A protein has these predicted regions:
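A short, well-structured beta->alpha microelement
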Residues: 125-142
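Active-site-adjacent loop/helix micro-motif of nuclease/hydrolase catalytic cores
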Residues: 132-133, 162-164
Length: 496
């Protein structure tokens, strides 16, 4: 207030309300992976977290889908084949995929299709020269330390790497979440390396690889999903490459008309490459006239539509948070753009996933007749912990901690006296009361749902005050999901 030296009227404003707690964000994921590009105009976005809100913005800054190439050939063996059919004895119609598989674009489609919104993208490389490895992921995680708004970490392409690399990436991610103490990791289980590998071996390998540190800061989902991101029109002659198409008499047999058509399609001048138009014309002819080619095209589509569930689950987290609140378990929810899970999990099999001896629970995605495909699990990897067994409990606590922490910064260097303690207690109590009214805390009255303690002789000693320390204790009763519902029926004697 100005000093009163000149006669006149002076205005003094006083705050009528105390400082309030602003709710922290709860479902802002950061996706780390390979993109077509990473630019904003002339600015490079490589290894730089960039905020987007839609698939349109993703394409604007990070480009479109990859252009996979599948080679079709006539071979004398069936090794390394995505699709293989013996046409005549000793000769195989074979489809192989020699190019690296980049899936972040498709995973982002799944994220937005399942309720996702605002998120961050960290591009660690491009399709031409990028790869997912431990060093790239560590650099990306370091860049995310500066973005406190991020609350979920997802690396959907980790499972495209070798099993050992995937293990190291996942342990780095969960360590990052535990050290930051404001974010949660969503994991996938590495796919089978051989068809004969069992589901139990897959799960055991993941549980062994994830380690034992900060397990409450992550959750895993199983199995892979057969999605509908890729349609028939996305599979054309530029995807299915058949450079030996002009000479396939042994395959087509009597179908000389088709052979002649292909010869015309691929008639090129010496020294020039086959055009995409020629490839697409041949592709259309083969689809109509040869069932084996159509089967191969469908197999390629199925292969590209096979995606891990983590990105879709990030969308589910965002949708549930926005509609019900972070305290609602992200389970018993249907998945969009999913035709089926790759494995059919029975009740008996889920027992070992949901409640393993080591506590490292894996949340199942299951098909229920007449209901659809649902997320059927809500546990963290710390399933043996009474405190942090459930995803919504861990994430609700992160939400409360981050919100209160941000609000408490306003009181740093304030006098460590009773008035300050009272203001702090009132501010935190008001925030928790709002959470309780929304259903985030359990209790019929506020006193049963939470309590805030601060003050000399209550949470602090005289030494604490002398050393500039203010200690606050907050007790909360977070709601827990009804994971098991038991209904008892008993007959009673007729009364009239």
């Amino acid at each position: 207030m100005a000093q009163m030296k000149t006669p006149g009227v002076y205005i003094q404003e006083k705050n009528a309300f105390s400082t309030s707690v602003v709710e922290a964000a709860t479902a802002i994921p950061a996706f780390i992976g390979i993109t077509e590009k990473a630019v904003n105009g002339s600015e490079s976005l490589a290894n730089k977290p960039w905020k987007i809100t839609s698939m349109t913005e993703f394409v604007q800054y990070f480009g479109g889908a990859p252009k996979p190439v599948f080679n079709l050939s006539i071979a004398t063996d069936s090794n390394d084949a995505l699709y293989c059919k013996e046409i005549v004895e000793g000769q195989y119609f074979k489809v192989s995929n020699p190019s690296a598989l980049y899936t972040l674009y498709y995973n982002m489609v799944m994220f937005f299709a399942n309720g996702g919104g605002t998120c961050y993208i960290v591009s660690v490389g491009t399709y031409k020269k990028g790869k997912i490895d431990n060093d790239n992921i560590k650099l990306a995680l370091d860049s995310l330390k500066k973005i406190r708004e991020v609350t979920l970490i997802v690396v959907p392409e980790a499972v495209n790497t070798a099993k050992e690399t995937c293990k190291n990436i996942q342990t780095d991610v969960i360590m990052h979440c535990g050290e930051m103490q404001n974010r949660f990791a969503i994991f996938d289980v590495h796919p089978k390396e051989k068809d004969e590998d069992s589901m139990s071996q897959q799960i055991e390998d993941f549980q062994t690889g994830i380690g034992s540190n900060y397990l409450s800061y992550g959750a895993a989902y199983y199995p892979y999903l057969n999605t509908s991101v890729i349609s028939d029109k996305d599979i054309d002659g530029t995807v299915l490459r058949w450079e030996t198409a002009p000479k396939l008499e042994s395959v087509f047999g009597e179908n000389s008309k088709l052979q002649k058509y292909l010869d015309d399609c691929f008639k090129i001048e010496e020294g020039k490459e086959i055009t995409d138009t020629a490839r697409n014309n041949a592709h259309s002819a083969l689809l109509i006239n040869w069932d084996e080619y159509k089967n191969a095209a469908n197999k390629v589509k199925e292969y590209l539509n096979l995606l891990p569930p983590s990105a879709a689950m990030a969308g589910i987290y965002a949708m549930v948070d926005n509609t019900r609140g972070v305290w609602k378990a992200p389970a018993n929810v249907s998945l969009n753009y999913v035709n089926s899970p790759t494995e059919t999990i029975s009740d008996l099999e889920q027992e070992d996933l949901n409640m393993p001896m080591n506590g490292k629970a894996i949340n199942a995605i299951r098909t229920f007749p007449g209901e659809g495909i649902k997320v059927w699990g809500a546990r963290t990897l710390d399933g043996n912990s009474q405190d942090w067994r459930y995803i919504n409990v861990r994430r609700t606590m992160l939400f409360i901690e981050e919100s209160v922490k941000n609000a408490a910064k306003a009181y740093v260097f304030e006098p460590n006296i009773s008035n300050t303690w009272l203001n702090m207690k009132s501010m935190i109590g008001s925030f928790l009361n709002g959470v309780w009214k929304q259903g985030g805390l359990a209790g019929s009255v506020p006193e049963d749902a939470y309590s805030v303690q601060v003050g000399l002789g209550e949470t602090m000693t005289q030494d604490d005050v002398l050393n500039g320390i203010m200690r606050i204790t907050v007790l909360v009763a977070i709601t827990r999901p009804a994971e098991f519902i038991e209904i008892t029926f008993q007959q009673q004697v007729q009364k009239s």
